[in-house]
Protein backbone atom coordinates (compact mmCIF):
# COMPACT_ATOMS: atom_id res chain seq x y z
CA UNK A 1 0.00 0.00 0.00
CA UNK A 2 1.29 3.43 -0.98
CA UNK A 3 1.39 5.82 1.97
CA UNK A 4 0.67 9.44 1.09
CA UNK A 5 2.24 12.34 2.92
CA UNK A 6 1.88 16.08 2.38
CA UNK A 7 4.30 18.89 3.19
CA UNK A 8 3.12 22.50 3.42
CA UNK A 9 5.97 24.82 2.49
CA UNK A 10 8.88 24.27 0.10
CA UNK A 11 11.56 25.95 2.17
CA UNK A 12 14.62 24.25 3.70
CA UNK A 13 12.62 22.42 6.36
CA UNK A 14 9.84 21.25 4.06
CA UNK A 15 12.16 20.12 1.29
CA UNK A 16 14.38 18.23 3.74
CA UNK A 17 11.42 16.35 5.19
CA UNK A 18 10.04 15.65 1.71
CA UNK A 19 13.36 14.14 0.63
CA UNK A 20 13.67 12.02 3.77
CA UNK A 21 10.11 10.71 3.40
CA UNK A 22 10.62 9.91 -0.28
CA UNK A 23 13.72 7.89 0.57
CA UNK A 24 11.63 5.92 3.06
CA UNK A 25 9.17 5.00 0.33
CA UNK A 26 6.39 7.50 0.94
CA UNK A 27 4.55 9.34 -1.83
CA UNK A 28 5.07 13.02 -1.02
CA UNK A 29 3.39 16.15 -2.35
CA UNK A 30 4.75 19.56 -1.36
CA UNK A 31 2.50 22.63 -1.53
CA UNK A 32 4.27 25.98 -1.87
CA UNK A 33 2.56 29.40 -1.68
CA UNK A 34 5.11 31.16 -3.89
CA UNK A 35 5.71 30.54 -7.59
CA UNK A 36 9.05 28.82 -6.97
CA UNK A 37 10.28 26.24 -4.48
CA UNK A 38 13.14 26.96 -2.10
CA UNK A 39 11.68 29.32 0.47
CA UNK A 40 14.19 31.62 2.12
CA UNK A 41 16.94 30.09 -0.02
CA UNK A 42 15.27 31.76 -3.01
CA UNK A 43 13.71 34.94 -1.64
CA UNK A 44 15.94 35.73 1.32
CA UNK A 45 19.55 34.88 0.55
CA UNK A 46 21.10 37.00 -2.22
CA UNK A 47 22.53 35.49 -5.39
CA UNK A 48 26.06 36.54 -4.46
CA UNK A 49 25.87 34.37 -1.34
CA UNK A 50 23.86 31.44 -2.69
CA UNK A 51 23.52 31.04 -6.48
CA UNK A 52 19.95 30.06 -7.30
CA UNK A 53 21.17 27.38 -9.72
CA UNK A 54 22.34 25.41 -6.69
CA UNK A 55 18.89 25.57 -5.10
CA UNK A 56 17.20 24.57 -8.36
CA UNK A 57 19.56 21.61 -8.68
CA UNK A 58 18.54 20.40 -5.22
CA UNK A 59 14.85 20.84 -6.03
CA UNK A 60 15.25 18.86 -9.26
CA UNK A 61 16.96 16.12 -7.27
CA UNK A 62 13.89 15.82 -5.05
CA UNK A 63 11.63 15.57 -8.08
CA UNK A 64 13.78 12.73 -9.37
CA UNK A 65 13.10 10.96 -6.06
CA UNK A 66 9.39 11.18 -6.87
CA UNK A 67 8.46 14.24 -4.82
CA UNK A 68 5.66 16.30 -6.38
CA UNK A 69 5.94 20.06 -5.82
CA UNK A 70 2.92 22.25 -6.49
CA UNK A 71 3.57 26.01 -6.41
CA UNK A 72 1.09 28.89 -6.08
CA UNK A 73 -0.83 26.81 -3.56
CA UNK A 74 -1.74 28.75 -0.42
CA UNK A 75 -3.00 26.14 2.01
CA UNK A 76 -5.86 27.62 3.98
CA UNK A 77 -7.13 29.54 0.95
CA UNK A 78 -6.79 27.33 -2.13
CA UNK A 79 -7.13 24.15 -0.10
CA UNK A 80 -7.69 23.50 3.59
CA UNK A 81 -5.92 21.00 5.81
CA UNK A 82 -9.20 19.13 6.21
CA UNK A 83 -9.51 18.82 2.43
CA UNK A 84 -5.97 17.48 2.18
CA UNK A 85 -6.73 14.83 4.78
CA UNK A 86 -10.28 13.91 3.78
CA UNK A 87 -10.49 14.55 0.03
CA UNK A 88 -6.91 14.07 -1.15
CA UNK A 89 -6.11 11.04 0.97
CA UNK A 90 -3.07 12.32 2.85
CA UNK A 91 -2.52 10.42 6.07
CA UNK A 92 -0.07 12.89 7.58
CA UNK A 93 0.83 16.53 6.97
CA UNK A 94 4.07 18.28 7.88
CA UNK A 95 3.60 22.04 8.24
CA UNK A 96 6.75 23.97 7.31
CA UNK A 97 5.23 27.38 6.67
CA UNK A 98 8.26 29.29 7.94
CA UNK A 99 8.45 32.40 10.10
CA UNK A 100 8.07 35.09 7.49
CA UNK A 101 6.18 37.77 9.41
CA UNK A 102 8.34 40.86 10.03
CA UNK A 103 8.73 42.60 13.36
CA UNK A 104 9.03 46.38 13.42
CA UNK A 105 10.40 48.65 16.15
CA UNK A 106 7.18 50.49 16.95
CA UNK A 107 8.63 53.97 16.40
CA UNK A 108 7.04 56.95 14.59
CA UNK A 109 7.49 57.05 10.83
CA UNK A 110 7.60 53.32 10.13
CA UNK A 111 4.75 53.63 7.61
CA UNK A 112 6.59 56.15 5.41
CA UNK A 113 7.39 55.31 1.79
CA UNK A 114 10.83 53.78 1.63
CA UNK A 115 10.59 51.85 4.90
CA UNK A 116 10.80 48.12 4.25
CA UNK A 117 11.03 45.05 6.41
CA UNK A 118 14.08 42.97 5.57
CA UNK A 119 11.82 40.18 4.29
CA UNK A 120 10.01 42.47 1.87
CA UNK A 121 13.17 44.18 0.69
CA UNK A 122 15.10 40.97 0.08
CA UNK A 123 12.10 39.31 -1.57
CA UNK A 124 11.70 42.22 -3.97
CA UNK A 125 15.40 42.14 -4.82
CA UNK A 126 16.05 38.40 -4.95
CA UNK A 127 12.78 36.90 -6.14
CA UNK A 128 10.80 39.65 -7.85
CA UNK A 129 13.80 41.46 -9.41
CA UNK A 130 12.01 44.72 -8.57
CA UNK A 131 15.08 46.76 -9.51
CA UNK A 132 14.61 45.97 -13.20
CA UNK A 133 12.93 48.53 -15.51
CA UNK A 134 9.23 47.89 -15.93
CA UNK A 135 8.82 46.02 -12.66
CA UNK A 136 5.24 45.99 -11.41
CA UNK A 137 6.51 46.31 -7.83
CA UNK A 138 9.47 48.68 -8.22
CA UNK A 139 11.81 49.09 -5.30
CA UNK A 140 12.82 52.58 -4.29
CA UNK A 141 16.38 53.40 -5.28
CA UNK A 142 18.23 55.66 -2.86
CA UNK A 143 21.58 57.33 -2.50
CA UNK A 144 21.64 56.64 1.25
CA UNK A 145 20.22 53.57 2.98
CA UNK A 146 20.10 52.66 6.68
CA UNK A 147 19.63 49.05 7.73
CA UNK A 148 18.57 48.61 11.36
CA UNK A 149 19.94 45.44 12.94
CA UNK A 150 23.18 43.52 13.09
CA UNK A 151 22.42 39.97 12.01
CA UNK A 152 23.14 38.07 8.82
CA UNK A 153 19.89 39.30 7.26
CA UNK A 154 20.93 42.90 7.93
CA UNK A 155 24.26 42.27 6.19
CA UNK A 156 22.45 40.77 3.19
CA UNK A 157 20.10 43.76 2.94
CA UNK A 158 22.96 46.26 3.24
CA UNK A 159 25.07 44.54 0.61
CA UNK A 160 22.08 44.33 -1.76
CA UNK A 161 21.45 48.07 -1.33
CA UNK A 162 25.09 48.74 -2.19
CA UNK A 163 24.78 46.66 -5.35
CA UNK A 164 21.65 48.58 -6.33
CA UNK A 165 23.63 51.80 -6.44
CA UNK A 166 23.34 53.34 -2.98
CA UNK A 167 26.34 55.57 -2.32
CA UNK A 168 26.15 55.29 1.45
CA UNK A 169 24.80 52.26 3.28
CA UNK A 170 24.69 52.18 7.07
CA UNK A 171 24.26 49.32 9.50
CA UNK A 172 22.60 50.84 12.57
CA UNK A 173 22.97 48.62 15.62
CA UNK A 174 22.19 49.34 19.27
CA UNK A 175 25.14 47.40 20.70
CA UNK A 176 28.85 47.30 19.82
CA UNK A 177 30.81 45.64 17.02
CA UNK A 178 31.76 42.76 19.30
CA UNK A 179 28.08 42.04 19.96
CA UNK A 180 26.97 41.89 16.33
CA UNK A 181 25.00 38.63 15.93
CA UNK A 182 26.05 38.26 12.28
CA UNK A 183 28.80 35.79 11.47
CA UNK A 184 32.26 37.31 11.51
CA UNK A 185 32.86 36.64 7.81
CA UNK A 186 29.59 38.36 6.89
CA UNK A 187 30.63 41.46 8.82
CA UNK A 188 34.04 41.41 7.16
CA UNK A 189 32.48 41.14 3.69
CA UNK A 190 30.22 44.09 4.46
CA UNK A 191 33.17 46.17 5.64
CA UNK A 192 35.14 45.27 2.51
CA UNK A 193 32.26 46.53 0.38
CA UNK A 194 32.16 49.88 2.14
CA UNK A 195 29.20 49.39 4.46
CA UNK A 196 29.34 51.96 7.29
CA UNK A 197 28.71 50.61 10.80
CA UNK A 198 26.97 52.90 13.29
CA UNK A 199 27.06 50.92 16.51
CA UNK A 200 25.74 51.89 19.95
CA UNK A 201 23.05 53.71 17.98
CA UNK A 202 19.30 53.21 18.34
CA UNK A 203 16.62 54.72 16.06
CA UNK A 204 13.74 56.53 17.78
CA UNK A 205 11.96 58.08 14.78
CA UNK A 206 11.93 57.85 10.99
CA UNK A 207 11.65 61.29 9.40
CA UNK A 208 9.59 62.01 6.30
CA UNK A 209 9.17 64.79 3.75
CA UNK A 210 5.99 66.48 2.50
CA UNK A 211 5.41 63.58 0.07
CA UNK A 212 5.45 60.96 2.79
CA UNK A 213 8.88 59.62 1.80
CA UNK A 214 11.77 58.88 4.12
CA UNK A 215 14.29 61.69 4.41
CA UNK A 216 16.20 60.72 7.55
CA UNK A 217 16.20 59.04 10.93
CA UNK A 218 16.58 60.31 14.48
CA UNK A 219 18.79 58.12 16.65
CA UNK A 220 20.10 58.17 20.20
CA UNK A 221 23.49 57.05 21.45
CA UNK A 222 23.51 53.93 23.58
CA UNK A 223 25.77 52.63 26.32
CA UNK A 224 26.72 48.99 26.44
CA UNK A 225 24.99 47.16 29.26
CA UNK A 226 24.17 43.59 30.17
CA UNK A 227 22.82 41.41 27.33
CA UNK A 228 19.03 41.21 27.13
CA UNK A 229 16.55 39.05 25.25
Annotate each PLM feature:
Residues 97-111, 115:
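Flavin (primarily FAD) binding-site architecture
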Residues 14-15, 154:
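N-terminal Rossmann-fold NAD(P) dinucleotide-binding loop
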Residues 8-12, 149-151:
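Glycine-rich Rossmann-fold phosphate-binding loop(s) that bind the pyrophosphate
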Residues 26-42, 170-178:
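Glycine-rich FAD pyrophosphate-binding loop
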Residues 53-103, 129-135, 163-229:
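A Rossmann-like FAD-binding core segment of flavoenzymes
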Residues 18, 22-23, 42, 158, ...:
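Gly/Ala-rich phosphate-binding loop of Rossmann-like dinucleotide-binding domains
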Residues 2-3:
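Short, small-residue-biased leader/transition segments that mark boundaries at the very start
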Amino acid sequence: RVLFRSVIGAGPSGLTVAGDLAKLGYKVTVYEALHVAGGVLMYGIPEFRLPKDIVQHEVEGLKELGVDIECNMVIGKVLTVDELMNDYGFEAIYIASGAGLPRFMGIPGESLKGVYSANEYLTRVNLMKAYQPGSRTPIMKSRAVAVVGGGNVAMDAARCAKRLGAEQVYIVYRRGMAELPARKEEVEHAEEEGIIFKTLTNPVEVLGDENGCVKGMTCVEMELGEPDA
